[in-house]
Amino acid sequence: MSDEQSAAQPSRIETEQLLREMNDEWVKALVRRDEATLERLMSEDFFFTYPLEGDDRTQFISDVTSGDLIVEHITRHQLGVRVFGNTAVLTSRDSAKWIYRGREIEGQYKVIQVYSERDNQWQLVAVQACPIA
């Protein structure tokens, strides 16, 4: 590999930092109901599985922007990032309060987020949030 090719590839640490920043941006966009940011960060084939149901990208963004799903707060702890080529897995322990169609959901969750690099751009492709004691 030439020096020019090496310079073009971000280091593992740079990639992990980028994904942490994207994760922060995604959480902020949820709280703000920022449709444009959610659409930019989430892949077309995104899927979210959480305690009440599962949603694809279109339904999830619609729920957030319509107010059917209100994210009052999410605090991430123990955020870990592992990069495997063009796939990355982020894990965290979240303290969160959501209101879904009038039903308040508050607690601690173990969250797994999967990112994929497509056409030199990282996107969020899947999230699973599981309640923990």
Task: Tell me what each language-model feature is.
Residues 2-133:
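A beta-strand edge to alpha-helix "cap/lid" segment located at domain peripheries
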